[in-house]
């Protein structure tokens, strides 16, 4: 039934398999035991934060150096930034003797040591970061440098548009179980910007950092927070000849009706200039920021509409008085309108400037 000599060959194969697998099983048991009882090799996600020195919190000094800032979107209230992020802190576990080591500075990979978990609060999605350098001094001071790019969300205030100034914020926090463990500080020597940093249509005034004294709760954990502020002001000169002056010229043309005696001509003039103003306003509206509050430009546009409304009433009253055989009274109202409209318009603009700019 079976080939001759089959049973002895099967027995020999089983014996050979036992001789092969028994040593391998023993090695596996030893390796599992070493992994179970040996201390872990700490990496960035495994090393616990260094303990406070002399019952003081661990201070992480931060700095952001702007390389470029671009694509400021008024409607989305976002901007893009390309910059360096520098961190420094002391970890005594990394201290070494430069004489014995033969080096004055040691370099590490990000996975080899503990690194504070710095997060950008108002960044859309996650920042794109490339670690440039991680170096450690003999006393354990760690210098961390990365280059990053991000799209940042920052609320804008358009109340004074187009004469507005804005503060663009970049918020940093550090994750910590207890605020006594890790706090953020500003390294002023590492805060700055390139001289050629610019934003189209804006003047960059300053770039500073502010430490927020009050921590806030996030996911039942307290955070330490920094606020990097980029102060900018809008280049408003182009808005004057392109938006403001055309609206004023159209309005002033309608006032020539106060020097005409023809009712039909006056009505045609006022209504046609009103239509021109509406058409121009629709064209300008596409470039104006959409806000739930009144802006300075919006207030001027609304005020101009009011003057058109009053001008139509004046022309109608003037014609009514003439029909009712009161030409003298109609003429006096017309003469008064020639002075009253410009004066009231000037006073209204002064009031608006005071309300929006606090002069």
From Swiss-Prot:
One GO cellular component term noted in the UniProt record for this chain: plasma membrane
InterPro entries for the chain: GABAA/Glycine_rcpt, Neur_chan_lig-bd, Neur_chan_lig-bd_sf, Neur_channel, Neuro-gated_channel_TM_sf, Neuro_actylchol_rec
Organism encoding this protein: Gloeobacter violaceus (strain ATCC 29082 / PCC 7421)
Family to which this protein belongs: Belongs to the ligand-gated ion channel (TC 1.A.9) family.
Subcellular location: Cell inner membrane
Activity regulation statement: Tetraethylammonium (TEA) and tetrabutylammonium (TBA) inhibit the proton-activated currents in a dose- and voltage-dependent manner in vitro, whereas the blocker of acid sensing ion channels, amiloride, has no effect. Channel current of GLIC can be inhibited by inhaled and intravenous general anesthetics at and below concentrations used clinically. Ion conduction is also inhibited by lidocaine and by divalent transition metal ions such as cadmium ions.
Protein name (database record): Proton-gated ion channel
Cytoplasmic domain ranges by topology: 259-261, 324-326
Lineage: Bacteria, Bacillati, Cyanobacteriota, Cyanophyceae, Gloeobacterales
Superkingdom, taxonomy of origin: Bacteria
Subunit structure: Homopentamer.
Segments on the Periplasmic side according to the record's topology features: 44-235, 287-294
């Amino acid at each position: 039934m079976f080939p001759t000599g089959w049973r002895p060959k099967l027995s020999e194969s089983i014996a050979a398999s036992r001789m092969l697998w028994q040593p391998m099983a023993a090695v596996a048991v030893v390796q599992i035991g070493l992994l179970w009882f040996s201390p872990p090799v700490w990496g960035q996600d495994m090393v616990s934060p260094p303990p406070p020195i002399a019952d003081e919190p661990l201070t992480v000094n931060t700095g952001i150096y702007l390389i470029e800032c671009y694509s400021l979107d008024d409607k989305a209230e976002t901007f893009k930034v390309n910059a360096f992020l520098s961190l420094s802190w002391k970890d005594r576990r990394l201290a070494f003797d430069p004489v014995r080591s033969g080096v004055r500075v040691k370099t590490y990979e990000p996975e080899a040591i503990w690194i504070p978990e710095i997060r950008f609060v108002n960044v859309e999605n996650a920042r794109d970061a490339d670690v440039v350098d991680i170096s450690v001094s003999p006393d354990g001071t760690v210098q961390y440098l990365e280059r990053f790019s991000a799209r940042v969300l920052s609320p804008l205030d358009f109340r004074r548009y187009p004469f507005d100034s804005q503060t663009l914020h970049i918020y940093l926090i550090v994750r910590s179980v207890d605020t006594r463990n890790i706090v953020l500080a500003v390294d002023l020597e590492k805060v700055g910007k390139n001289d050629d940093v610019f934003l189209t249509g804006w003047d960059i005034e300053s770039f500073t950092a502010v430490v927020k004294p009050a921590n806030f709760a996030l996911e039942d954990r307290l955070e330490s927070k920094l606020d990097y502020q980029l102060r900018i002001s809008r280049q408003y000169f182009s808005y004057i000849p392109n938006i403001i002056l055309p609206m004023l010229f159209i309005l002033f043309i309608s006032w020539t009706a106060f020097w005409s005696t023809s009712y039909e001509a006056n009505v045609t003039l006022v209504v046609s200039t009103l239509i021109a103003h509406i058409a121009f306003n629709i064209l300008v509206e596409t470039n104006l920021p959409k806000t739930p509050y009144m802006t300075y430009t919006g207030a001027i546009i609304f005020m101009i509409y009011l003057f058109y409304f009053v001008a139509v009433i004046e022309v109608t009253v003037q014609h009514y008085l003439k029909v009712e055989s009161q030409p003298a009274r109609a003429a006096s109202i017309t003469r008064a309108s020639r002075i009253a409209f410009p004066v009231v318009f000037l006073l209204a603009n002064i009031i608006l400037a005071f309300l929006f700019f606090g002069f």
